């Protein structure tokens, strides 16, 4: 065993932990199909949101960790449940009245309200695929509609008929009495209306491969369960899909947690081994509510990328997948700065075990680019933007180049992008919410002391020396908690309750410019 493999096996990073579970489930052997299958799922009822991206990003992290631990081939599929019947019209789509006329129809049988694709389902699938492609995910796309109609599930659907009683025995205890009377794992597609029907099944025949039900007019209808004439209810569908495709690893959100046992048991009833599973926590919006594709109450991938690099979004996905996290625009600056810190630590670290534990290793699948920001963070750029209100990033570069003469847009592309992002973020989220504190007489005395301290400093002084001078003034200012001292300074000078290390900010903004800013407040 190589030292690299030993270090990977010892790693406690969650993608490696998941990869080890998969390898253990296979007893270290290649499956009969010749590869390990990773599956992600997508419900195309609404526009893809950042959680959809997150599931795929996390899945690839585990896939790449598994490839590090073994020589077994892998494959990632993205499965779209586009044959589901429409149950609710999303609030964030055009032509909702038109779509409302197709309730209970498969998503791929509803006209595209955006007027671009063959159907509503095809449009949503295209949106998903476009951003998965944009970020370089290597995957195969599976459509539920195509799989059912092409007969790819036929063998398992016949097996569901053969195991009908056993599956019903598993499912019925999970329902209320009124639902028990009407439930069947099969949902026929009505030959007349094309709707996905949830109706009682009066007869089933495994040899003929058919089910019999009564339609809304009371007419007895017999249909085959194969070739797309029926689909399964979502819980049996999950387990059937695992069995048919021989899935080895699946992730799902906490809303599936209670049903994970059912999916697994159905897979076993159908004669296959269920996959290793990871249940991740759901993202919450600014009000602490679950984000939803149909509500559109979250950040889209495009939203995030308007204000920050993709690596920061991937870091947000990496961190604590089993813990609920609030996902709104105010998490962006923190994740950008944390990414910068992790990137710098990775390239300074010689211990491979610690490198394997660093999030950037998994974000970049072991090929981590080295970025240079010369100690300038996203938060610092936001504060600089706050005081100089630039029309474009060239204004910020005037300050940056004076702070660090080696830094230029052409040799610091990452920092150049951050400057552009910071201006956008400030204009859209910070500017309108700034609230300045009018300085009291006590505050004015403190500001005068800081001004006097700055007057005697050369422009070449280190940021740490400036920070110490401000700290010393605070120690003499009579505050019980120095945090309140700095909070007051931030509110007076920057119009916000928190901010950067003032020594670094003053060094970047300039001593003479800071003196003018203080004089304005006096």
Curated annotation (Swiss-Prot):
GO terms for molecular function: ATP binding; lysine-tRNA ligase activity; tRNA binding. It comes from the Bacteria. ATP binds at residue 293. SUPFAM superfamilies: An anticodon-binding domain of class I aminoacyl-tRNA synthetases (SSF48163), Nucleotidylyl transferase (SSF52374). Keywords: Aminoacyl-tRNA synthetase, ATP-binding, Cytoplasm, Ligase, Nucleotide-binding, Protein biosynthesis. InterPro entries: aa-tRNA-synth_I_codon-bd_sub2, aa-tRNA-synth_I_CS, aa_tRNA-synth_I_cd-bd_sf, Lys-tRNA-ligase, Rossmann-like_a/b/a_fold. PROSITE patterns: AA_TRNA_LIGASE_I (PS00178). Its EC number is 6.1.1.6. It catalyses: tRNA(Lys) + L-lysine + ATP = L-lysyl-tRNA(Lys) + AMP + diphosphate. It is an enzyme of class 6 (ligase). It is found in: Cytoplasm. Its main location: cytoplasm. Belongs to the class-I aminoacyl-tRNA synthetase family. This is Lysine--tRNA ligase. It comes from Rickettsia bellii (strain RML369-C). The lineage of its organism: Bacteria, Pseudomonadati, Pseudomonadota, Alphaproteobacteria, Rickettsiales. The gene is lysS.
């Amino acid at each position: 065993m190589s030292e690299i493999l030993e270090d990977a096996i010892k790693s406690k990073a969650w993608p490696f932990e998941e990869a080890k579970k998969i390898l253990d489930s296979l007893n270290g052997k290649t499956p009969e199909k010749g590869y390990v299958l990773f599956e992600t799922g997508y419900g195309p009822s609404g526009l893809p949101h950042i959680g959809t991206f997150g599931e795929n990003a996390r899945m690839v992290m585990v896939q790449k960790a598994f490839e590090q631990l073994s020589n077994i081939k892998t494959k990632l599929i993205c499965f779209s449940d586009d044959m589901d019947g429409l149950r609710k019209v999303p609030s964030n789509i055009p032509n909702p009245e038109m779509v409302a006329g197709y309730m209970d129809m498969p998503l791929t049988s509803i006209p595209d309200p955006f007027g671009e694709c063959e159907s509503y389902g095809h449009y949503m699938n295209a949106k998903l695929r476009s951003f998965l492609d944009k970020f370089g995910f290597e995957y195969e796309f599976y459509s539920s509609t195509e799989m059912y109609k092409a007969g790819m599930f036929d063998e398992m659907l016949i097996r569901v008929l053969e195991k009908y009683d056993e599956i019903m025995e598993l499912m019925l205890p999970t329902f209320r009495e009124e639902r028990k009377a009407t439930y069947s794992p099969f949902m026929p597609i009505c030959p007349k209306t094309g709707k996905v029907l949830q109706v009682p099944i009066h007869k089933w025949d495994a040899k003929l491969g058919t089910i019999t039900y009564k339609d809304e007019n009371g007419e007895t209808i017999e249909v085959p369960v194969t070739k797309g004439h029926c689909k399964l209810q979502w819980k049996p569908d999950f387990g059937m899909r695992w069995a048919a495709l021989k899935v080895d690893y699946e992730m799902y959100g906490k809303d599936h947690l209670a049903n994970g046992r059912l999916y697994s048991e159905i897979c076993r009833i159908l004669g296959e081994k269920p996959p290793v599973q990871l249940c991740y926590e759901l993202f919450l919006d600014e009000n602490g509510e679950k984000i939803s594709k149909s509500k559109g109450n979250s950040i889209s991938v495009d939203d995030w990328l308007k204000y920050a690099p993709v690596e920061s979004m991937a870091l947000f996905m990496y961190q604590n997948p089993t813990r609920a996290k609030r996902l709104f625009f105010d998490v962006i600056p923190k994740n950008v700065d944390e990414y910068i810190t992790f990137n710098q630590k990775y390239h300074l670290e010689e211990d491979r075990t610690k490198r394997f534990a660093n999030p950037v290793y998994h974000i970049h699948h072991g090929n981590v680019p080295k970025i240079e920001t010369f100690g300038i963070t996203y938060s610092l750029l936001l504060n600089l933007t706050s005081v100089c209100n630039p029309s474009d990033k060239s204004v910020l570069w005037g300050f940056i180049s004076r702070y660090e003469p080696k830094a230029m847009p052409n040799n610091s592309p990452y920092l150049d992008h951050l400057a552009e992002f910071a201006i956008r973020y400030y204009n859209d989220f910070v500017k309108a919410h700034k609230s300045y504190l009018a300085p009291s007489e006590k505050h004015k005395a403190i500001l005068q002391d800081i001004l006097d301290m700055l007057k005697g400093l050369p422009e070449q002084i280190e940021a740490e020396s400036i920070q110490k001078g401000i700290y010393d003034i605070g120690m003499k200012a009579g505050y019980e908690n120095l945090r309140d001292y700095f909070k007051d300074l931030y509110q007076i000078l920057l119009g916000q309750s928190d901010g950067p290390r003032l020594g670094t900010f003053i060094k970047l903004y300039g001593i003479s410019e800071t003196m003018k800013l203080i004089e304005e407040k006096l």
